[in-house]
Amino acid sequence: MSDMKKVTLVLSDGTKFHGKSFGYDAPVAGEVVFNTAMMGYPESLTDPSYAGQLMTLTFPLVGNYGVPPFTFEENGLPTFMESDKIYASAIIVNDYSEQYSHWNAVESLADWLKREKVPGITGIDTRELTKVLREHGVMMGKILFDDEPDNIPEANYEGVNFVDQVSCKEIIRYNEGAGKKVVLVDCGVKANIIRCLINRGVEVIRVPWNYDYTDTDFDGLFLANGPGDPDMCEDAVNIIRKQISQSRKPICGICMGNQLLSKAAGATIYKLKYGHRSHNQPVRMVGTNNCYITSQNHGYAVDAKTLGNDWEELFVNMNDGSNEGIRHKVNPWFSSQFHPEACSGPVDTEFMFDKFVETLK
């Protein structure tokens, strides 16, 4: 620990937290957010939804099970990660464990961060930082090295189309010839979403976020997760509107997909004070007493009161009452704000994939 450089996290309101660098030694700026999950840092770091963000982990000890190998399955999906690289701009922890032990680990978290050129800081009171963000809302911040001048520009999060940065640039097919065809709109899709569809025997046609698929031959539409503000994705929303105006084909959405489908249904989106990023968010299925523990990662939410008359809420968050999913009253169109594929987190709601695939038949 003695050879780690001293760094300071400076929030946009001037609040400072002092720590040490254990990742790539470079200053960085971004939106500071917090995640209260106890595990899953390899999956979270490679989740494209964290693009542009400095990810704070509230669990005090991080790194003690190392990092799994970057291997790929026959279908081209990463075996243990959620994409092919780290998307978070930095990771902020309280106590980084230099020693790691796990049957599947091949390197330390520090070595992985350095190889991918991603900063990491330790020694921060992450729970105090979380209290600040919870009280004042998420804010922009910088990680600066104490012996270097502040010479990096301020970062922007609002008004940036992160989806365009992380989406695929060409069509990718999985499980070709398997049967029913699903067009998956890639806003920053996690690998396990594709895996959950493949495992249910469908062919997945992964298309860029602004690709017009309305004249394509397919059986169902899947709207994937992704980073940033859904209001930056008007092209995707307009294509969804076009699709639902001309076809009753099944539609399912997750996270950003819930927001884009809601916008196509006439709803407005607002930014949450500090977002939902954890493995233990309770949601209730509307019209039932069924409550599920879910994995979540989003900073924006749907204003359910603004949904069109043909739509209704499907899930509601039990902590703050915010929307967690919508459905059409007649057609097989539904979505969830949470992540039924988890990875990491609970798999209580994986039945959402079953329901979607059943509607394809």
Where are the predicted features?
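Proline-centered loop/turn at the N-terminus of a beta-strand
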Residues: 119, 181, 250-252, 268, ...
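Active-site-proximal beta-strand elements of phosphoester/diester hydrolases
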Residues: 181-186, 294-295, 334-338
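A glycine-centered loop/beta-turn motif at secondary-structure junctions
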Residues: 325-361
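RNA-binding accessory domains that recognize and position tRNA/RNA substrates
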Residues: 2-210, 230, 238, 343, ...
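Catalytic beta-strand/loop cores that center a nucleophilic Ser/Cys/Thr
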Residues: 290-331
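Short acidic/histidine-rich motifs immediately flanking catalytic phosphotransfer sites
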Residues: 216-221
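Residue-level detector of beta-strand face positions
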Residues: 8, 282-284, 314, 325
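Cysteine-nucleophile active-site neighborhood
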Residues: 225-304, 345-355, 359
